[in-house]
Curated annotation (Swiss-Prot):
Taxonomic source organism: Paracoccus sp. (strain N81106 / MBIC 01143) (Agrobacterium aurantiacum)
Descriptive protein name: Beta-carotene ketolase
Reactions catalysed, as given in the entry: all-trans-beta-carotene + 2 AH2 + 2 O2 = echinenone + 2 A + 3 H2O; echinenone + 2 AH2 + 2 O2 = canthaxanthin + 2 A + 3 H2O
Lineage: superkingdom: Bacteria
Record-level GO BP terms: carotenoid biosynthetic process
Signal peptide: none
UniProt-listed Enzyme Commission number(s): 1.14.99.63
InterPro entries according to UniProt: FA_desaturase_dom
Enzyme class: oxidoreductase
Function: Converts beta-carotene to canthaxanthin via echinenone.
Gene (name only): crtW
Length: 242
């Protein structure tokens, strides 16, 4: 058994517990912010809630990403698809089918013109393409409908705008910078192999806070795509800083 392997039952149980914890925490902060939080009276709590939702929104996307690689519920593709679609809906109403097709293409053609996540331009143009790849007419129609429903339910409470779309937008920037642009930008450090991916030289706590280890261990992810995010640090051999 390799250093980063776990028995299938233990891997499944841990993945479900970790994923369930992230989803539950996101839902708790989401409900608290929209229905109970008085942001004007408790600005520090409101800021903490906002930052927490932003980070947990990154976590929702990472769960979907792991589900695409079959590592949330190993050996159960339908369960992975169900989990992936759930968290993508919570995150921004994204399509599971569209997302998984594009992401598998990214792994096959990482850092090339055939990579849907790659662009030769600067970070702003690259981010615009990155978002445009996944945010289409479906999402453009769905999100205003959801915001309208929230407006009808909550009345003049503006928190449904501040505490749902904005954390998702900031999370997308976080995902792009630490999980796409830094690992795959050309002309910075030489890539170690054909995956055209590098791992950022950051500590494990920073790696966790920025992109759930997909910044600090991005090259390792391309080497071991079925390893869940919380096991990525175990995939690096001692002394390896790639």
């Amino acid at each position: 058994m390799s250093a980063h392997a776990l028995p299938k039952a233990d891997l499944t149980a841990t993945s479900l517990i970790v994923s369930g914890g992230i989803i539950a925490a996101w839902l708790a902060l989401h409900v608290h912010a929209l229905w109970f939080l008085d942001a004007a009276a408790h600005p520090i709590l409101a800021i903490a809630n906002f930052l927490g939702l932003t980070w947990l929104s990154v976590g929702l996307f990472i769960i979907a990403h792991d589900a695409m690689h079959g590592s949330v519920v190993p050996g159960r593709p339908r369960a992975n698809a169900a989990m992936g679609q759930l968290v993508l809906w919570l995150y921004a109403g994204f399509s599971w089918r569209k997302m998984i097709v594009k992401h598998m293409a990214h792994h096959r053609h990482a850092g090339t013109d055939d990579d849907p996540d790659f662009d030769h331009g600067g970070p702003v143009r690259w981010y615009a393409r990155f978002i445009g790849t996944y945010f289409g007419w479906r999402e453009g129609l769905l999100l205003p409908v959801i915001v309208t429903v929230y407006a009808l339910i909550l009345g003049d409470r503006w928190m449904y705008v501040v505490f749902w779309p904005l954390p998702s937008i900031l999370a997308s920037i976080q995902l792009f910078v630490f999980g796409t642009w830094l690992p795959h930008r050309p002309g910075h450090d030489a890539f170690p192999d054909r995956h055209n991916a590098r791992s950022s030289r950051i500590s494990d706590p920073v790696s966790l806070l920025t992109c759930f280890h997909f910044g600090g261990y991005h090259h390792e992810h391309h080497l071991h795509p079925t390893v869940p995010w919380w096991r990525l640090p175990s995939t690096r051999t001692k002394g390896d800083t790639a």
